[in-house]
Amino acid sequence: MAAPGERGRFHGGNLFFLPGGARSEMMDDLATDARGRGAGRRDAAASASTPAQAPTSDSPVAEDASRRRPCRACVDFKTWMRTQQKRDTKFREDCPPDREELGRHSWAVLHTLAAYYPDLPTPEQQQDMAQFIHLFSKFYPCEECAEDLRKRLCRNHPDTRTRACFTQWLCHLHNEVNRKLGKPDFDCSKVDERWRDGWKDGSCD
């Protein structure tokens, strides 16, 4: 141990540990200034008082943070726009879909697949379509939506025996989701008009 008057001095050959396990050896041959303080001690104090530099805009840390963006497929348009209020850029139509847009397009694809499904599918076609629906629920981009769909499929397995069975099964599944979201039911007797043949009034001709 050092004598009371010698606390803080490092003799030649003594070792001390720095953060990270690095070791540094202090030598006694440092020149002293007019007040008797070591130049090395003065330099250490000066460097300790220098504030740490914040990451610049072109630093890897800042660049990595700028790339992190919320999941558009997981939120609706209004929520997404609230996160973009500080941006001056105008909304473009060719941006990634938000949760509502993704849902609309996904249901359109599923209903159209059902509308053109074979009237009397083979056993292999029945199995393939049922498997497709289950795989769709596993890879759907909105995880909350996908989890909800998987739970519904466990309770209500896809009915792919015929085209009529499949279109009605999908329509009732869609209505279950609509009710959860507070949306009105769709008239399932009109699935062919909506997704294959067009409305009887000729408005789609």
UniProtKB/Swiss-Prot annotation:
Its EC number is 1.8.3.2. Residues 32-44 have a biased composition (Basic and acidic residues). Keywords: Cataract, Cytoplasm, Deafness, Disease variant, Disulfide bond, FAD, Flavoprotein, Growth factor, Mitochondrion, Oxidoreductase, Phosphoprotein, Primary mitochondrial disease, Secreted. The keyword Oxidoreductase applies. GO terms for cellular component: cytosol; extracellular region; mitochondrial intermembrane space; mitochondrion. Residues 1-65 are annotated as: Disordered. Residues 95-195 form the ERV/ALR sulfhydryl oxidase domain. InterPro entries: ALR/ERV (IPR039799), ERV/ALR_sulphydryl_oxid_sf (IPR036774), ERV/ALR_sulphydryl_oxidase (IPR017905). It comes from the Eukaryota. FAD binds at residues 99-107, 111, 140, 171-183, 194-195. It catalyses: 2 R'C(R)SH + O2 = R'C(R)S-S(R)CR' + H2O2. Disulfide bonds join 142-145, 171-188. The modification Phosphoserine is found at residue 59. It is an enzyme of class 1 (oxidoreductase). Ubiquitously expressed. Highest expression in the testis and liver and low expression in the muscle. The keyword DNA-binding does not apply. One of its GO terms (molecular function) is flavin-dependent sulfhydryl oxidase activity. GO terms for biological process: liver development; mitochondrial disulfide relay system. Its cofactor is FAD. Residues 45-60 have a biased composition (Low complexity). It is linked to Myopathy, mitochondrial progressive, with congenital cataract, hearing loss and developmental delay: A disease characterized by progressive myopathy and partial combined respiratory-chain deficiency, congenital cataract, sensorineural hearing loss, and developmental delay. PANTHER family: ALR/ERV (PTHR12645), FAD-LINKED SULFHYDRYL OXIDASE ALR (PTHR12645:SF0). Homodimer; disulfide-linked. May form heterodimers of isoform 1 and isoform 2. Interacts with CHCHD4/MIA40. This is FAD-linked sulfhydryl oxidase ALR. It comes from Homo sapiens (Human). The lineage of its organism: Eukaryota, Metazoa, Chordata, Craniata, Vertebrata.
